[in-house]
From Swiss-Prot:
Alphabetical list of Pfam families matching this protein: Anth_synt_I_N, Chorismate_bind
Cofactor binding note from Swiss-Prot or TrEMBL: Binds 1 Mg(2+) ion per subunit.
Gene: trpE
Top-tier EC class: lyase
Protein name as annotated: Anthranilate synthase component 1
One example of a Gene Ontology biological process annotation: L-tryptophan biosynthetic process
């Protein structure tokens, strides 16, 4: 174990900072993020992971607990509620609240060589669009879900899957009015809390680990599933979008439907299964005020790192082959598919425009164009669009410029969003929005909220869509949206079977295989 913080450094840091990290780092060989969370009795706020062994993006897991600040949108304004002082700050824009946080709390960040050492983590819902683009109206139906919810946690566990290093970070908070002895008391109290947390990790608590063959489960039927769309109404709206395309209003529109299914499994059980069934570069479990979010997204929205901007447009998909030869054949087939390539080119143009609005003139480039990247179950055509953030432009402005992703709206983006607000019967909530971390250092990583479940009061909500173009067949587009939801319904089916329907049998089958 390597203790990186000492009281002398803490006292020196306290002269210019009010929020100071206490850090301990050690290396593990068997302890995993899932085991850690079970040892904490699942009393966490979020888990962010990258889990796809074939992807170069997969390396870290971040566990946040003990939130001290909650940021959310309320009636067009953003508020930050401090759980300790019970104070409340409000501002007109998200970046205003984040600037207030950094100025007020005077946060020092540890230098650990990892991409995230603390900050605001949560979601921006699709329904936030009218706050960013006033020409897009709010949906006519109400939703009880906040348009934005971000948590700033006192404690962060950062797990490096490559080095097996685990960093425990505890942010000690000062007011700036303490005496030296009072500062020492704060240090010792936070150090003790950190030690207690680490001791829980060393606990020999028996953790039940999943043993399952995900391939043995077929995608379940939709018998117990309800939708906000009748099939005939969905197909009629496909025809309406095609008429708008024919009239020249848009080139593409992404029409979606929301499925709901009653469940017995809890959200973390769903997450444990999802990370096996559908591992992806962006995986997340979040415990909100009144619901939980579970997701596995393959697609980045935007990445901001020290002023470097990056978007990875994804469009064009094939399933992985059974062997190398079939994989290669499918890659060639995908790259010859003119429809898939045309959609991809459109998304690259959208990404260039999104970055161009906030980038230094002449800095936008496409260093990788139409590259095929393989994931665990599928392969995608992916490009990389980059730029350099303009001086004086806030990193959150880059996030807002890219939000929402064109892959979930269509193009041109604004007109497509206007039409979708008219056609879709209910607000999208998280679907098509983003999950993001906004670091204390201003760096951001975010993914598009797809392949995601929202769990509330024993009901899982799943939304999936289809990209409508001029020659779309309504029946096929309806089936595509159902097929996309099927992967998550499969997750629910497995979790119910493993944890609830056959609990006695499950206990016998549980063994160490996947962490």
């Amino acid at each position: 174990m390597n203790f990186q913080s000492n009281i002398s450094a803490f006292l020196e840091d306290s002269l210019s900072h009010h929020t100071i990290p206490i850090v301990e780092t050690f290396t593990v060989d068997t302890l995993t993020p899932i085991q850690m969370i079970e040892k904490l009795d699942r009393e966490i706020t979020y888990l962010l992971e990258s889990k796809d062994d074939t992807s170069t993006w997969s390396r870290y897991s971040f566990i946040g607990l003990n939130p001290f600040l909650t940021i959310k949108e309320e009636q067009g304004r953003f508020s930050a509620a401090d759980q300790d002082s019970k104070s409340l700050y409000t501002g007109n824009e998200l970046k205003e609240v984040l600037n207030w946080m950094n100025t007020t709390y005077k946060i020092k960040t540890p230098e650990l060589g990892i991409p995230f050492v603390g900050g605001a983590v949560g979601y921006l819902s699709y329904d936030m669009i009218p706050l960013i683009e006033p020409s897009v109206p709010s949906h006519t139906k109400e939703t009880d879900m906040e348009k934005c919810m971000l948590f700033v946690c006192r404690t962060l566990i950062a797990y490096d899957h490559e080095t097996k290093n685990v960093h425990f970070i505890q942010y000690a908070r000062l007011t700036g009015e303490e005496t030296k002895n009072e500062k020492m008391d704060v240090f010792h109290q936070n150090h003790l809390e950190l030690q207690n947390l680490i001791e829980k990790m060393m606990d020999q608590k028996n953790i039940k680990e999943l043993f399952l063959s995900a391939d043995s489960y077929k995608t379940p039927s939709f018998e117990t599933v309800s939708s906000n769309y009748e099939k005939s109404a969905f197909m009629a709206d496909v025809e309406k979008i095609k008429s708008y395309i024919k009239a020249g209003d848009i080139f593409q529109g992404v029409l979606s439907q929301k499925f709901e299914v009653p469940i017995k499994a809890d959200a973390f059980e769903l997450y444990r299964v999802l990370r096996i069934v559908n591992p992806s570069p962006y995986m997340y479990y979040m415990k909100l005020l009144d619901r939980e979010i579970v997701g596995s997204s393959p697609e980045r929205l935007i990445h901001v790192q020290d002023g470097h901007l990056e978007i990875h447009p994804i469009a064009g998909t094939r399933k992985r082959g059974a062997d190398k030869a079939e994989d290669e054949r499918l890659k060639v087939e995908l790259m010859k598919d003119e429809k898939e390539k045309a959609e991809h080119y459109m998304l690259v143009d959208l990404a260039r425009n999104d970055i161009g609005r906030v980038a230094e003139y002449g800095s936008v480039s496409v260093p990788e164009f139409t590259k095929i990247v393989s994931f665990s179950h599928v392969m995608h055509i992916i490009s990389v669009v980059t730029g350099r953030l303009k001086k004086g432009v806030h990193p959150v402005d880059a996030l807002m410029s890219a939000f929402p992703a064109g892959t979930l709206t269509g193009a041109p983006k604004i007109r497509a969003m206007q039409l979708l607000q008219e056609l879709e019967p209910t607000p999208r909530e998280t679907y098509g929005g983003c999950i993001a971390y906004i670091g204390f250092d201003g760096n951001i990583d975010s993914c598009i909220t797809i392949r995601t479940m929202s769990v509330k009061n024993g009901v899982a909500s799943i939304q999936a869509g289809a990209g409508i173009v001029a020659d779309s067949v309504p029946e096929a587009e309806y089936e595509e949206s159902c097929n996309k939801a099927g992967a998550l319904l499969k997750t629910i089916h497995i979790a119910e079977d493993m944890f609830h329907s056959k609990e006695d049998k499950a206990d016998e089958q549980i063994s160490t295989i996947v962490r």
